[in-house]
UniProtKB/Swiss-Prot annotation:
Broad enzyme group: lyase
Species this chain originates from: Mycobacterium ulcerans (strain Agy99)
Full protein name: GTP 3',8-cyclase
Residues engaged in binding [4Fe-4S] cluster 1: C49, C53, C56
Pathway in which the depicted protein is active: Cofactor biosynthesis; molybdopterin biosynthesis
Catalysed transformations (reactions): GTP + AH2 + S-adenosyl-L-methionine = (8S)-3',8-cyclo-7,8-dihydroguanosine 5'-triphosphate + 5'-deoxyadenosine + L-methionine + A + H(+)
The protein's assembly and partners: Monomer and homodimer.
Biological function: Catalyzes the cyclization of GTP to (8S)-3',8-cyclo-7,8-dihydroguanosine 5'-triphosphate.
């Protein structure tokens, strides 16, 4: 069996993090050198997952992060607290891997819900197991969910995820809706071969069920580094596939820093009206308005999904650092954020960590 290593990027230690932070503002918003303010925190709880989507993970053989390297519940309460006050984070999203595999998920959500000012709290999940936990998560303080679902065709789903769990995901969506975790959003990464067919049925399903579809261009974040730009099913391809079947109009509302370009769908003979979005991270990059900062399951700050460097907050935590030192390191990490991801540059290098070890 071939074992795929997670890969460890260049990590700034405590001394390096402090040096970078000296150039960053010492208070106020969490800024980078280009004037962008990070207000959206993505927190990965685990790198493990119970599906094996080909664009993210190999079928087998992926080395997991050792348990002692993962942040514990107390650390996962403290870091978001620092992020909200004094760093000004207003939205916290818990991700994985698959965050439902984290046994302390409800505890971590409840801690975030106690923060003041209270951030919006959301979850990105594959939906397997969500039906049983949606009500408890809502009670803990979760506001809404995004559920990953690339197709409603059972055979296509099994081929993409290497697991026959479509019914579980559909049940999870329904459970989230029943628990009031709305709007329920569906994240779809389309297969280059079947995606044009899948997206038509997926949008029809979402409109009928009252979910909001988000189609996300496949990015170079797979563990096997098999992504190819010339195989991309881009946003223009998605719209071309949908337009023969639906009446679409651009949403006139200001987009702001949101990653999705939204489209309104007029009611048709067989479908209600609604909206969907396309996140064109590759073909129409939105790096200039990015407002995200990322915390990996092992306590590293990443300023971008495609960063080649990380800043170690776990080391600071476990060395007994105070909140001010952690804040300074975080500010330094974000101050060094690049202008863009560079995917379309000839010298682009794919991150060593796959998406499962970063957090979406």
């Amino acid at each position: 069996m071939t074992v795929t290593a997670l890969g460890v990027p260049t990590v700034r230690g405590r001394s390096e993090g402090s040096a970078v932070a000296s150039d960053a503002p010492g208070d106020g918003p969490l800024l980078d050198r280009f004037g962008r303010s990070a207000t959206d925190l993505r927190v990965s709880l685990t790198d493990r997952c119970n599906l094996r989507c080909g664009y993210c993970m190999p079928a087998e053989g992926l080395n997991w992060l050792p348990g002692e390297q993962l942040l514990g519940p107390a650390e996962l309460a403290r870091l978001p607290r620092i992020a909200v006050t004094p760093l000004g984070i207003t939205s916290v999203r818990f991700t994985g891997g698959e965050p439902l595999l984290a046994r302390h998920l409800e505890e971590v959500v409840a801690a975030a819900a106690q923060l003041r000012p209270r951030p919006e709290i959301s979850l990105t999940t594959n939906g397997v197991g969500l039906a049983k936990r949606a009500a408890a998560l809502a009670e803990a303080g979760l506001d809404r969910v995004n559920v990953s679902l690339d197709t409603v065709d059972r055979a296509h789903f099994a081929a993409v995820t290497r697991r026959d769990r479509l019914t579980d995901v559909l049940d999870g969506l329904a459970g989230a809706r029943a628990a009031g975790l709305t709007p329920v959003k569906v994240n779809a990464v389309l297969d280059p071969e079947t995606g044009r067919q899948d997206v038509v049925e997926l949008l029809r399903f979402c409109l009928e069920q009252g979910y909001q579809l988000r189609v996300i261009e496949q990015m170079p974040l797979d563990a096997g580094h098999q992504w190819r730009r010339n195989a991309l099913l881009g946003s223009d391809d998605v719209l071309a596939a949908l337009q023969p079947h639906f009446r679409l109009r651009p949403d006139p509302a200001p987009r702001g820093s949101a990653p999705a370009e939204l489209w309104l769908v007029d009611a048709g003979p067989d479908t209600p009206a609604g909206k969907f979005g396309v996140i064109a991270s590759v073909s129409h990059a939105f790096c200039s308005t990015c407002d995200r900062t990322r915390l990996t399951a092992d306590g590293q700050v990443r300023s971008c999904l495609f960063s080649t460097e990380e800043t170690d907050l776990r080391g600071l935590l476990r060395a007994g650092a105070g909140d001010e030192a952690i804040e300074a390191a975080w500010r330094g990490a974000m101050w060094a954020k690049p202008a863009g991801h560079g995917i379309n540059n000839p010298d682009f290098l794919q991150p060593q960590r796959p998406m499962s070890a970063i957090g979406g």
